[in-house]
């Protein structure tokens, strides 16, 4: 009996163990199969363009691609441009070495193809893989629909194809992994080529305007023409469709800039079409995928047109044309170049030839021409007055002798030095007289100026400079009959500067097809910025350059005409950067008689129109030249559209005076000086008067808690509301002067006055600067006073110090009011000026000063004792919402005393508790800079804090544990993706054997269990 029992128990254990073991084997094999599938195809899509694709194959298993995962992440058709390329790099995992292969090779052994797109700027990139096809200059679209593999994979090979792309395209880089079958089926992918839709474009408005809507253009004064189009398109536009228009050969869109760009057509921040400059003056705009399903599409273009100095070399009328869909827009303009500067003996003229902002280089051409007589001992110098790189390289200077007639010299200062029939290079002959400097300057000595010379300069300027001003100067001595006059020389100076213009283009459309009662419109307001300006400088050059997704930085200076026979001054530059800022200046109005805030004025600058006038060297005695350089393809004096809608202005300083009328019609000046570094703000406020009879003692208590503030008596007119004025400045000093109102009447009781002088006041330390503020604190007393008059002076001792980054500020308040009236009882005016207050120490960067006028307005006769107390600690309002921002401050968990957490339940702290507990506001003090506009951080934070300080640590502890878990889990994912080299992982044969083995174990266990039951029954 016992043996059977033991046998039954042993069988039961064996059966249960078999079932459990078999189940674990089956489950383990299933997970192993899933791991094999993951190792076989792992695709990651990263924002920075780096993708990891691991493939593992076997001889018998057929796999499918995971392209659908990419499509679920971001669905679109990628438009690529394939160009001939001889750089096709092939790499294999077995032997990681570069192998050159032709791009058009058969894809039989190709397993994975990566297409890398070369772009000017790094942008978020999504990756896909397309098959390498025949080279073609046309655009094509690759459909990303997943393909299933039907053949076994072979030895893994990875082909990386680097294909260049035009600068105007901004397409994502796509990488995708596929097997041999997918590579073969990719040849059947849908390929679409854009259609020329120029015939579907209607020119509603087309015009060409000269400078400031005139018929004249002076290229050397930085002037240009503007082409304006208002276009309407037929419905049915698709991605890749394009339209063209052609300009006449006497103008171009770049000026002296080496970049050849035109603006994108945008609907707000959405790019609807990209532009490019083709040969023969043709401009092409290609629509993006945002044009799909759009109807009623319109576009507005404003493109700068610069006079081509090569084509138009003389003064006179020029007809400028633009042709779009066989409709020609034309304008006849009077082109006038400047003659340079000269005298009886010689003439000097120059112009900036090219400007390459990408390489910080520019080229300049100067003509030195003799007029009458002979000039000896001539020295010609070229100097970068603005934008010089002191540690740069020497410029490249070449000297040419002009062989033609002086009358045939191009008025546009254009020199085709490759034409040997007109220009002969003599640089080697004058090498001993030519001196070059590392700062970009040169000096050339000519013994006798009897021929016309051309000096071609090629140099660099300082990267990041906002001004480029190149000066050419000639000093000569005319040959005299008598040596007595030899010392009488002359100087000619010619400056060349730069001004940057911008183009503008925008468009819009509605989603279609239009459904009844569907009012959804595809419209986004395009922000327009008007740029106009005045240049008093003789020589201005315009440059155009566009940077994708950039904002405008505008640095402007007013040029000044100088004397001494030449023009000097600043050059105006408008250029694009990626940084931007908004400056907001605001003024707070003074309290009016009724006790309310008279007004609040706030002026902010963000994408608002910016106006300044342009007028280059008009009415100047001497002339300077201007070369065109354009940036961001928007017309100066026209409009600019930016994506971030932020405009930054650099100015030296700004001063403003704000005046306003108070109740007694006196004028108060609110003088504010704004500087970039110190941010000093001075505020002078005068409060209105008080009238009435106060028969009881009037007591004023000012509690400064954790804010630096002071208050004065408000107007007593029977109103019980509060008037609060807050002045909050970050990183600034605030000087505040206040005058309290007065009370008129006779005083019958004893009068007691206390004066707190500077010795007694708390010191506020800020930034290493000591500011002492003195106020008139002795009251003026009028009326009949029957009691004794006593005055007490409290010196500046035992006062706390407030530290703010190392600055000390002594503040004295005008705290004693003027008293007039019939007061039958003793009247005590008392101010608590931070005696024995705790010391507050901040980080040295942010300080907040509050000025509050929180006393109630009282009128009438008061029989009893009158006490007016001020509690600058705002009442605690539990439902105040914006608490999440407070814990972000690193100083929030620093309260040393547990008193603050123990008092959050008090709904309205009575005013007498404020003076009695001066140390209560100590902990919330560091939170003031985090919420400058909300002075109630303790009340907002406490309801969400635990009542015990010990529990705060418990709240933070789970966050630390979670981070540790994440770090522990992260490494487990990496070895999984790196195990793709295992050859047998994921094999069907090994998987089936394991599952069969586990199933047999399970069946055996069940049989044993059933047998065990039979034995028990027996």
Curated annotation (Swiss-Prot):
Q: Where is the composition biased (Polar residues)?
A: 39-61, 78-92, 129-139
The record's D- repeats, renumbered to this chain, cover: 745-782, 783-820, 821-859, 860-878
Q: A cellular component term (GO) from this record?
A: extracellular region
Q: Where is this region: Fibrinogen/elastin/tropoelastin-binding?
A: 194-511
The answer to whether the entry has keyword Signal is: yes
| Signal peptide region | 1-36
Q: Which residues carry this modification: Pentaglycyl murein peptidoglycan amidated threonine?
A: 985
InterPro entries, per this entry?
Adhesin_Fg-bd_dom_2, Adhesion_dom_sf, Fibrogen-bd_dom1, Fibron_repeat-bd, LPXTG_anchor, SDR_Ig, YSIRK_signal_dom
Q: Tell me where it resides.
A: Secreted, Cell wall
Positions of region (5 X tandem repeats, Pro-rich (WR)): 879-948
Q: Indicate what this protein is called per its UniProt record.
A: Fibronectin-binding protein A
């Amino acid at each position: 009996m016992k043996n059977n029992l033991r046998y039954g128990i042993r069988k039961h254990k064996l059966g249960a163990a078999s079932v459990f073991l078999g189940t674990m084997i089956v489950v383990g094999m299933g997970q192993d199969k899933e791991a094999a599938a993951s190792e076989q195809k792992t695709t990651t899509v990263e924002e920075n363009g780096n993708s990891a694709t691991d493939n593992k194959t076997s001889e018998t298993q057929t796999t499918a691609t995971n392209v659908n995962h990419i499509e679920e992440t971001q669905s679109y058709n990628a438009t690529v441009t394939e160009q001939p390329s001889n750089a096709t790099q092939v790499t294999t995992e077995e032997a990681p070495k570069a192998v050159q292969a032709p791009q058009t090779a058969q894809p039989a052994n190709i397993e994975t193809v990566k297409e890398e797109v070369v772009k000017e700027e790094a942008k978020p990139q999504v990756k896909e893989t397309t098959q390498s096809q025949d080279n073609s200059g046309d655009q094509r679209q690759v459909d990303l629909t997943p393909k299933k593999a039907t053949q076994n994979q072979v030895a893994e090979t990875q082909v990386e194809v680097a294909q260049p792309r035009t600068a105007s395209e901004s397409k994502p880089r796509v990488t995708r992994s596929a097997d041999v079958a997918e590579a073969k089926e990719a040849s059947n992918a849908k390929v679409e080529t854009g259609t020329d839709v120029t015939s579907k474009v209607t020119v509603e408005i087309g015009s060409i305007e000269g400078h400031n809507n005139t018929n004249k253009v002076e290229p050397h004064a930085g002037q240009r023409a503007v082409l304006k189009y208002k276009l309407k398109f037929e419905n049915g536009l698709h991605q890749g469709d394009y339209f063209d228009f052609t300009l006449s050969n006497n103008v171009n869109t770049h000026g002296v800039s080496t970049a050849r760009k035109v603006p994108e057509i945008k609907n707000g921040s959405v790019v609807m079409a990209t532009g490019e400059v083709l040969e023969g003056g043709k401009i092409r705009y290609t629509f993006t995928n945002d044009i799909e399903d759009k109807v009623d599409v319109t576009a507005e273009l404003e493109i700068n047109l610069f006079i081509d100095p090569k084509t138009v070399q003389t003064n006179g009328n020029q007809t400028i044309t633009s042709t779009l869909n066989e409709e020609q827009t034309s304008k006849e303009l009077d082109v006038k170049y400047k003659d340079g500067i000269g005298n009886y003996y010689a003439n000097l003229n120059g112009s900036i030839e090219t400007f390459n902002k990408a390489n910080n280089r520019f080229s300049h051409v100067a003509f030195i021409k003799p007029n009458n007589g002979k000039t000896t001992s001539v020295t010609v110098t070229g100097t970068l007055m603005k934008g010089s790189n002191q540690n740069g390289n020497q410029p490249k200077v070449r000297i040419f002798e002009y062989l033609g007639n002086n009358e045939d010299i191009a008025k546009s200062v254009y020199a085709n030095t490759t034409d040997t029939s007109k220009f002969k290079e003599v640089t080697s002959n004058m090498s001993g007289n030519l001196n070059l400097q590392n700062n970009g300057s040169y000096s050339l000595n000519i013994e006798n100026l009897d021929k016309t010379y051309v000096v071609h300069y090629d140099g660099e300027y300082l990267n990041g400079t906002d001004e480029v001003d190149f000066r050419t100067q000639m000093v000569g001595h005319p040959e005299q009959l008598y040596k007595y006059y030899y010392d009488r020389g002359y100087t000619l100076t010619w400056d060349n500067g730069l001004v940057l213009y911008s183009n503008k283009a925008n468009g819009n459309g509605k989603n279609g097809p239009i459904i009844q009662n569907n009012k959804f419109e595809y419209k986004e307001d395009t922000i327009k910025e008007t740029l106009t300006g005045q240049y008093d400088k003789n020589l201005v050059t315009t440059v155009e350059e566009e940077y994708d997704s950039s904002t405008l930085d505008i640095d402007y200076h007013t040029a000044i005409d100088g004397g001494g026979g030449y023009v000097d001054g600043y050059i105006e530059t408008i250029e694009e950067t990626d940084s931007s800022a908004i400056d907001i200046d605001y003024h707070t109005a003074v309290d009016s008689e009724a006790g309310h805030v008279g007004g609040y004025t706030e002026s902010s600058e963000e994408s608002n129109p910016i106006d300044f006038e342009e007028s280059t060297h008009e009415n100047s005695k001497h002339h300077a030249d201007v070369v065109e350089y354009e940036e961001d393809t928007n017309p100066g004096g026209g409009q600019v559209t930016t994506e971030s809608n932020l405009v930054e202005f650099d100015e030296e300083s700004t001063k403003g005076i704000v005046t306003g009328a108070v109740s007694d019609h006196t004028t108060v000046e609110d003088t504010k000086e704004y500087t970039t570094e110190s941010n000093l703000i001075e505020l002078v406020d005068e409060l209105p008067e008080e009238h009435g009879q106060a028969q009881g003692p009037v007591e004023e208590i000012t509690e400064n808690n954790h804010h630096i503030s002071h208050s004065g008596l408000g107007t007593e007119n029977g109103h019980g509301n509060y008037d609060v004025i807050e002045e909050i400045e970050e990183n600034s000093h605030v000087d505040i002067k206040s005058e309290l109102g007065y009370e008129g009447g006779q005083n019958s009781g004893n009068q007691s006055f206390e004066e707190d002088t500077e010795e007694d006041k708390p010191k506020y330390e800020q930034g290493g600067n000591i500011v002492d503020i003195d106020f008139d604190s002795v009251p003026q007393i009028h009326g009949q006073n029957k009691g004794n008059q006593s005055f007490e002076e409290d010196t500046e001792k035992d006062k706390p110090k407030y530290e703010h980054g190392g600055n000390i500020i002594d503040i004295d308040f005008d705290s004693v009011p003027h008293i007039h009236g019939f007061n039958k009882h003793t009247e005590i005016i008392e101010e608590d000026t931070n005696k024995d207050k705790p010391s507050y120490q901040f980080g040295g960067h942010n300080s907040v000063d509050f000025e509050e006028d929180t006393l109630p307005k009282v009128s009438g006769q008061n029989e009893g004792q009158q006490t007016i107390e001020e509690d600058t600690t705002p009442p605690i309002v539990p439902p105040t919402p914006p608490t999440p921002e407070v814990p972000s401050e690193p100083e929030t968990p620093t309260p040393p005393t547990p008193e603050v957490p123990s008092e959050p339940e008090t709904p309205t702290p009575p005013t007498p508790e404020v003076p009695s507990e001066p140390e209560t506001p100590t902990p919330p003090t560091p939170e003031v800079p985090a919420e400058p506009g909300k002075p109630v951080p303790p009340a907002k934070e406490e309801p969400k804090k635990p009542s015990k300080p010990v529990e705060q640590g418990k709240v933070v502890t789970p966050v630390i544990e979670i981070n540790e878990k994440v770090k522990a889990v992260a490494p487990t994912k990496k070895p999984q993706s790196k195990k793709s080299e295992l050859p047998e992982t994921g094999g069907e044969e090994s998987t089936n054997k394991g599952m069969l083995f586990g199933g047999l174990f399970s069946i055996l266990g069940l049989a044993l269990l059933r047998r065990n039951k039979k034995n028990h029954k027996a």
